[in-house]
Amino acid sequence: MDKVGKYEFLAEPFHCDFSGRLFMGHLGNHMLNAADFHSTDRGFGMKYLMTIKRSWVLSRLAIEMNEMPEQYTKFNVETWVENAMRFFTQRNFAVVGKDGKQYGYGRSVWAMIDTDSRQPCDILSVKDGAINDWIEANKACPIDKGGRVKMSDKAEFVRTIDTHYNDVDINGHINSVKYIEHVLDLWNLEWYREHRIQRFEIAYVAEAHEGDKLSFYMEKEDNNDVSSLTYNVRIVRTDGVECCRSKVKFV
């Protein structure tokens, strides 16, 4: 079995936006599915982990796209493990058309938790470090890893939303992709008629659960470029704890 997994997806029309191209949230979901398929096929996926009360949780995700697949387009998500440490592992993605067209790339960081205590676990203790047998350090992923999203006290409050049944995933907390969708809803349809997302980053800090209210704060990144369309977002739950930060770059 290859170290790099390749999985076919379809840009279904109901997963596409008004322009007929795949939603960023659905692309993120395809990447997470590819990660699950890849890890399960190689013996360290969720199917096995749940038998030992462990689970993968997404810590960081960065996606950079040249363009999004159009509706009805078949494409592959390639994924591979770049490295593995005791508490974190880095997994990369490539989004490739059936004709070889390179749509874009993704980078992610994952942790493993004990599903009872919700505390981090030693990744290398699972099956005597079996993940190390699948590391592919030489395959290129030519996008930045991304860093800490810096925000000042001047970030403006945008809105507060409620969380419900459809926001919750198999781990019992708010789904990683739901945060992506909620962040991208901060801009209206008219904005998206004139701009597209070139790069999206999100870092998950703390869990939120059904019933929590999530408050969104946003500011334009100050990088001395007046033409820059990069925005930073902070999400805070009911008790004031920050859940995650996101950076969105438009062109």
What are these regions (language model features)?
Residues 53-68, 195-207:
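Small beta-barrel nucleic-acid-binding modules, principally OB-folds
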Residues 159-247:
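Acidic/His-leaning functional-site neighborhoods
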Residues 2-7, 64-147, 204, 208-210, ...:
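HotDog/MaoC-like acyl-thioester-processing domains
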Residues 1-58, 105-107, 114-198:
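Hot-dog-fold acyl-thioester-processing enzymes
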